[in-house]
């Protein structure tokens, strides 16, 4: 019986002990799967992120261009385009005139390249001179001497402008008689508005202006008469216009009136001011149609 009994008591494993070697903390299978799933999702997010995408990471980022500014802020002159923006018409004209005076070749290029002034633009400039003249006239009663010396400077400026603009609209520079006559009509109206002083010595500016404009009228009328035999002058009413100007000037446009009489005199003496209007229109219509002076048929043939 002693043989059957072991001298040492048997050792039974404790129910809390694991006979296999394992970590001290056991992990739940569900928790492990959750961790593995989160890690897989994290890996997928990293794969789909823009930073890990090879197509996007290889493309350089486009940034808006910025104006390069100097780090050093110092005073400097305006650029030419900005400077020109600050100049009005008078200042810009003065700068251009000085530049052309210093460099005549530039002035010639300006003369060739600039568009020809229209009649309206030229008369507008002359009207501005006339306004300055009227503004210089003193208010109230004053002596002729005082008035003359007050308006002398703007008066001479207007006369000089008339002398410069008038040749621009005379033949052969201007080939259209209507354009020339339109300018002369407006210029003559300005001369009518020049002041009249009692002393004859102060009237020489206006007298000289009338003489110059009368010769200009005569030149244009003579050239126009060569083309249409004076018919265009009469049909356009320029003979009537000149007659009114001559009356308003006190007969100072005699040279122009003589040229007009020579150009339209073949129509009959006093055709523009005398005679039956219906008869005159009949003659003009026959002239325009080419039937004036044609033989008249007599008899049945």
Curated annotation (Swiss-Prot):
The highest taxon in the source lineage is Eukaryota
Alphabetical keyword list: Cytoplasm, Nucleus, Protein transport, Transport
Main location, first listed in the record: cytoplasm
Annotated function: Involved in ubiquitin-mediated protein degradation. Regulatory factor in the ubiquitin/proteasome pathway that controls the turnover of proteasome substrates. Targets proteasomes to the nucleus and facilitates the degradation of nuclear proteins.
Protein's name in the database: Tethering factor for nuclear proteasome STS1
InterPro entries under this entry?
A: Cut8/Sts1_fam, Cut8/Sts1_sf
Describe the protein's quaternary organization and the partners it interacts with: Binds the proteasome.
Q: Where is this region: Disordered?
A: 1-56
């Amino acid at each position: 019986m002693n043989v059957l009994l072991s001298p040492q008591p048997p050792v039974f494993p404790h129910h809390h002990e694991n006979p296999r070697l394992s970590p001290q903390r056991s992990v739940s299978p569900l928790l492990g799967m959750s961790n593995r799933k989160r890690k897989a999702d994290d890996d997928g997010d990293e794969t789909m992120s823009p930073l890990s995408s090879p197509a996007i990471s290889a493309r350089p980022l486009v940034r808006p261009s910025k104006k390069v500014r100097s780090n050093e802020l110092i005073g400097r002159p305006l650029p030419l385009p900005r400077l020109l923006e600050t100049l009005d018409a008078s200042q810009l004209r003065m700068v251009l005139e000085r530049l052309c005076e210093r460099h005549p070749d530039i002035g010639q290029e300006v003369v060739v390249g600039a568009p020809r002034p229209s009649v309206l633009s030229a008369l507008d400039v002359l009207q501005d001179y006339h306004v300055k003249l009227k503004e210089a006239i003193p208010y109230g009663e004053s002596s002729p001497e005082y008035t003359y010396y007050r308006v002398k400077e703007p008066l001479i400026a207007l006369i000089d402008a008339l002398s410069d603009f008038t040749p621009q609209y005379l033949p052969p520079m201007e080939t259209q008689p209507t354009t020339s006559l339109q300018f002369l009509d407006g210029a003559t109206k300005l001369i009518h508005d020049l002041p009249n002083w009692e002393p004859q010595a102060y009237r020489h500016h206006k007298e000289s202006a009338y003489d110059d404009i009368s010769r200009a009228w005569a030149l244009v009328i003579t050239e126009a008469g060569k083309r249409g035999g004076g018919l265009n002058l009469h049909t356009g009413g320029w003979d009537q216009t000149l007659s009114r100007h001559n009356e308003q000037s006190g007969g100072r446009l005699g040279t122009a009136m003589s040229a007009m009489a020579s150009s339209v005199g073949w129509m009959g003496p006093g055709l523009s001011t005398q005679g039956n209007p219906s008869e005159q229109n009949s003659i003009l219509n026959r002239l325009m149609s080419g039937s004036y002076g044609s033989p008249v048929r007599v008899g049945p043939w």
